[in-house]
């Protein structure tokens, strides 16, 4: 029976790939919801496409998520998206309160640190 170190060598790259693909797909879904309202969210209208903050945010989420899911330019994209999430947290969530659970920013923080991990 192989030891833990041997199992880790076999499964670690596979699990990191699955994590990267799933984060990329889910992040793309967030961008599509912002840009074209797919999947539809009740009480939510899509943002104007090339407005400065929400439109650019949606575009970064779609393009960055697809690149991340495909494994293209992963480190560069992850660095850009981590910075994007940090800015989004401080611009959109911090004014609503200090604690991430109360200001709706916990998912933004999770994405930011996952992107930093991929960087």
Question: What are these model-derived regions, one by one?
Answer:
Residues 1-36, 54-59, 63, 70-119:
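Extended, low-polarity transmembrane helix blocks
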């Amino acid at each position: 029976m192989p030891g833990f170190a041997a199992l880790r060598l076999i499964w670690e790259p596979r699990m990191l790939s699955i994590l990267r693909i799933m984060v990329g797909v889910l992040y793309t879904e967030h961008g599509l919801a912002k840009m074209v309202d797919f999947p539809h969210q009740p009480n939510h209208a899509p943002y104007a496409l090339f407005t400065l903050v929400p439109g650019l945010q949606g575009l970064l989420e779609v393009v960055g998520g697809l690149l991340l899911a495909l494994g293209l330019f992963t480190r560069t994209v992850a660095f850009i998206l981590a910075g994007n999430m940090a800015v989004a947290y401080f611009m959109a969530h911090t004014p609503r309160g200090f604690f991430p659970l109360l200001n709706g920013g916990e998912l933004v923080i999770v994405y930011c640190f996952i992107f930093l991990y991929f960087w």
